[in-house]
Amino acid sequence: MHKINKRNLILFLIFLPFLSNKKILASQKKPNLVVIWKKKRVLALYNRDKLIKAYRIRLGFNPKGQKQKEGDGRTPEGKYFITHKNPYSKFFLSLGLNYPNQADKTRAAGKGNNPGSDIYIHGLGKKNIFLHYLFDWTNGCIAVTNKEIEEIYKKVDSGTVVYIYS
């Protein structure tokens, strides 16, 4: 067994606070909240009130306003949660949301509409990454690059709360 040199131990303890970068530590934490701002085209991962990382996103092809019905091309707004992870998505990887929630169902029913379903946070699959940065292209989902969804997929667990704001 090795004997610890006191001098080296003291030096290590003195410099430890400088070695532990807060950004590195924050990025290693599991997010307990996902916040999406449609207008800003941003998805942010939080652990408690600390930002872990933010990503540029693309939305449904008709992004303004609350999703009203199936096929309207809008991304829903409200409180959701991650229901499941799909490693076999045609968009590389995806995280399913509990859309429609009760508020969505009630709103759609009041207008005689089907609210739709299958809203995900997903990658590009085989879509062109350059087109991804030019315009909103999904049917209502939230899209990031394949590299980004791989990172998000590893960090975010089923049950994580997702807020989507206009």
Which ranges hold each PLM region?
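Hydrophobic h-region of N-terminal signal peptides that target proteins for export
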Residues: 13-22
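A structural motif detector for short, solvent-exposed N-terminal "entry" segments of globular domains
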Residues: 27-63
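N-terminal post-signal-peptidase region of extra-cytosolic proteins
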Residues: 27-32, 59-83, 105-107, 146-147
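Exported/periplasmic cell-wall-interacting domains
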Residues: 29, 84-166
